[in-house]
């Protein structure tokens, strides 16, 4: 409550009894809460003192206890922890508190979201499984699966942990790719650990037509040349750990390092044969570092009528074998704004850029423009160069919202 309270936590083997008293004239008096929790049905007990001066007393002998988290909240609180096993104390670092013993784990922080009770705080985990399929000339028919698993424990930023796994198979090349992104909250203070990894099979392909804006697409004018002519098979292994700071309004800053191994799979009678003719150049390993800033704020993820998303990434990569290195900058901005009062019609614009500094990069690290980067009507990676810039604008119409027993749907153009 927002008054002076005394919390008595008696711990027994496989069960814990919590009794809450009102403090009157400096001593505990009326009982306003009492309950015994069984370890068979309870994983953790969270006790919030809220405002005013509160006292927490933890007693009991044994080892197999329910984990207890004590959250003092505002004002001066007193903690008398006689048995600190599986006891965690949270309170404000800059406020005065009294600790009678040194037992238990203390986590003193001025993080408001941790120390203040929020009845909306989710107490369950979630798992989202998304099937994906599509078709285009470069990939052929493709099928895939995306799984997002979110853990919501006590300490969050904005969740305790999140795991994203995706896998796609491409029928045109018989290639596949897999990626994993993990984020773990508050590894050091309010800093998250971010892990990004990717693997592509030896048959996974990208396109390369040469450097410049006037490179020909011979497949259009010559029926004897297939789409395979400009395909390059790349086996990729990427590991990118980083630390991430998250802001309260949708911003984040990430700093990390990376290791990347890329192998070109030799294929006969393709354009790449004229570019890479030395078997020593087929495999390259890179070490890198990056710093990235992102901001995202939208009123709706499915059909935003008002939103802003921007990212900027500055990085450096060095070839381990040749010691050649280069740096790059990748900025992007996306804007969404409704142009009708009811939000059914939305104007959406996106700006993408890629700048490489120096010439010591491989062709698959160059800036590209194509169907997979906003240039509609062209093949993926249609144009390649040192730098690139793409701007696209959409008019979006939200025709109808449907609520079904399986999934909510937004139908639009």
Go through each PLM region and give its residues.
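Outer-membrane beta-barrel initiation region
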Residues: 46-48, 58-60, 71, 78-208, ...
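Transmembrane beta-barrel wall of Gram-negative outer-membrane proteins
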Residues: 176-197, 222-268
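Transmembrane beta-strands of outer-membrane beta-barrel proteins
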Residues: 132-134, 146, 162-168, 194-200, ...
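GD-rich hexapeptide-repeat beta-solenoids
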Residues: 2-25, 93-100
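Acidic/polar low-complexity surface segments
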Residues: 15-41
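Flexible, solvent-exposed coil segments and beta strand-coil junctions
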Residues: 25-28, 110, 121-128, 155-164, ...
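C-terminal outer-membrane beta-barrel translocator/porin domains of Gram-negative envelope proteins
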Residues: 179, 208-209, 223-229, 278-282, ...
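Detector for repetitive beta-architecture
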Residues: 4-6, 44, 53-55, 65-67, ...
């Amino acid at each position: 409550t927002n008054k002076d309270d005394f919390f008595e936590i008696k711990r027994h083997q496989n069960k814990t009894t919590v009794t809450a008293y009102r403090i009157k004239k400096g001593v505990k008096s009326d009982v306003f809460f009492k309950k015994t929790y069984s370890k068979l049905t309870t994983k953790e007990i969270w006790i919030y003192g809220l405002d005013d001066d509160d006292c927490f007393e933890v007693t009991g002998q044994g080892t197999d206890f329910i984990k207890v988290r004590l959250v003092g909240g505002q004002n001066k609180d007193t903690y008398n922890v006689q048995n600190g096993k599986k006891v965690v104390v949270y309170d404000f670092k800059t406020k005065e508190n009294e600790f009678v013993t040194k037992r238990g784990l203390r986590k003193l922080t001025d993080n408001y979201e941790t120390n203040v009770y929020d009845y909306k705080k989710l107490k369950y985990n979630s798992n989202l499984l998304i099937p994906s399929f599509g078709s285009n000339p470069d990939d052929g028919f493709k099928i895939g699966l995306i799984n997002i698993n979110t853990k919501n424990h006590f300490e969050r930023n904005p969740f305790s942990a999140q795991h994203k796994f995706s896998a796609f198979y491409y029928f045109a090349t018989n290639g596949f790719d897999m990626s994993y992104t993990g984020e773990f909250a508050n590894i050091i203070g309010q800093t998250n650990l971010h892990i990004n990894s990717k693997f592509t099979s030896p048959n996974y392909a990208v396109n390369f037509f040469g450097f410049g804006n006037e490179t020909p697409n011979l497949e259009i004018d010559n029926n004897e040349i297939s789409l395979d002519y400009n395909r390059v098979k790349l086996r990729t292994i990427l590991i990118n750990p980083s630390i991430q700071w998250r802001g309260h309004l949708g911003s984040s800053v990430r700093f990390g390092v990376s290791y990347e191994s890329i192998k070109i799979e030799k294929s006969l009678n393709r354009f790449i044969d004229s570019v890479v003719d030395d078997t020593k150049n087929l495999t390259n390993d890179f070490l890198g570092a990056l710093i990235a800033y992102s901001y995202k704020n939208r009123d709706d993820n499915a059909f935003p009528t008002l939103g802003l998303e921007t990212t900027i990434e500055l990085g450096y990569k060095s070839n381990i074998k040749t010691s050649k290195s280069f740096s790059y900058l990748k900025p992007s901005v996306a804007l969404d704004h409704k142009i009708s009062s009811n939000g059914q019609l939305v104007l959406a614009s996106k700006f993408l850029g890629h700048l490489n500094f120096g010439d010591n990069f491989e062709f698959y690290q160059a800036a590209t423009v194509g169907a997979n980067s906003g240039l509609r009507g062209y093949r993926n990676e249609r144009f390649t160069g040192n730098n690139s810039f793409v701007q696209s604008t959409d008019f979006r119409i939200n025709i109808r919202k449907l609520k079904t027993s399986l999934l909510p749907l937004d139908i639009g153009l």
